[in-house]
């Protein structure tokens, strides 16, 4: 799977750990930065990753900041993106099964590396349920962009 990833300075260490893990699992990762701990603006990196997913250049995207809130808001401003802020494994599974999310956000100050790995693994391995009522709800949400 080709995965877009982006973060701000507050989540650099977790992003780098995720990149290494994802590549070791055989995923292709497109890293949109940031690459240093210098203070930066999270919307720049979240938008870059989200645009790659929306354009079909990447299959899914992961964005990170200290809480995950800012990057999830920014990613969801890009047409075609359904980004969920995740802090537990159940939500990771449910957001794929019910919402067919194409991006996820993590808060590096909220969860540790081990839990982040579990959340990402679950989110990447869970398929959309294909249940008609879930698709209907997704269609209604996506129609709000028009």
What is each residue range found by the language model?
Residues 4-24:
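Glycine-rich phosphate/diphosphate-binding loop of Rossmann-like nucleotide-binding domains
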Residues 2-6, 10-11, 89-146:
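C-terminal binding/interaction regions
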Residues 6, 32, 64-65, 86, ...:
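Structural motif
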Residues 28-39:
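A short beta-strand-loop structural module common to alpha/beta enzyme folds
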Residues 45-85:
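Helix-adjacent hinge/juxtasegments
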Residues 16-19, 74-77, 117:
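Short amphipathic alpha-helical segments
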């Amino acid at each position: 799977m080709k995965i877009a990833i982006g973060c701000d300075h507050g989540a650099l260490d977790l992003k780098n750990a995720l990149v290494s893990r994802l590549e070791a699992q055989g995923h292709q990762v497109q890293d949109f930065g940031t690459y240093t701990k210098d203070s930066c603006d999270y919307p720049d990196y979240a938008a870059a990753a989200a645009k790659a997913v929306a354009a079909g250049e990447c299959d899914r995207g992961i964005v990170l900041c200290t809480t995950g809130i800012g990057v999830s808001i920014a990613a969801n401003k890009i047409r075609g993106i359904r980004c969920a802020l995740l802090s537990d494994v159940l939500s990771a599974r449910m957001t794929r099964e019910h919402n067919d999310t194409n991006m996820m956000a993590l808060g590096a100050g909220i969860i540790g590396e081990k839990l982040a790995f579990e959340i990402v693994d679950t989110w990447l391995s869970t398929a959309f349920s294909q249940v008609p009522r879930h698709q209907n709800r997704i269609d209604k949400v996506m129609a709000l962009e028009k």
